[in-house]
Amino acid sequence: EEAAEASKAADAAKAAEEAKGAVAADDALVEWLRRVYAPIDRMLGEVMNPFPKQLKALSADPYDDELMEAFCSYLEASGRRMDKVKQLFQSLPTPASARGFGLSLYHCLSEVEDALAELERYTMGYVDGYLHDGREMLREAKQRRKRLQDERRRLEIV
């Protein structure tokens, strides 16, 4: 009988330890979502959401110096935001329970950076292919961001 009680006590201690580990993992995930993902998502929106309006303004006359200057200012500000996004992404390790989510976020960030690089190339030589590719990459990144937001809602947090 004493052995059975000792076994029950050991099982209870093990269960408590596992629960503590799960709570710590949840805490790490909540912290990462709050300190890393949420600000990154906001900054991604600040880069992606103004793009259609910026492009429309430029398309009125791409050879107009003032319009091109405004578009270049948007690209520069977006580049600075993406630098902050990269620093933020690297500031805290992605919790094990969100590795796939973190990888998807990384791919989204890379796509936005690549799009901005293509758009920057466009401003240097007015080659429409760069503009088209940059626009497509941003469209893809926007879809990826939407999927991330949907996936974020499904992440299990106790």
Briefly describe each language-model feature range:
Residues 1-32:
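N-terminal Sec-dependent export signals
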Residues 13-14, 94, 123:
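Residue-identity detector for threonine
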Residues 21-95, 133-158:
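Alpha-helical segments in soluble extracytoplasmic regions
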Residues 60-63, 121-131:
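Charged, low-complexity interaction regions
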Residues 97-125:
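Amphipathic protein-protein interaction modules
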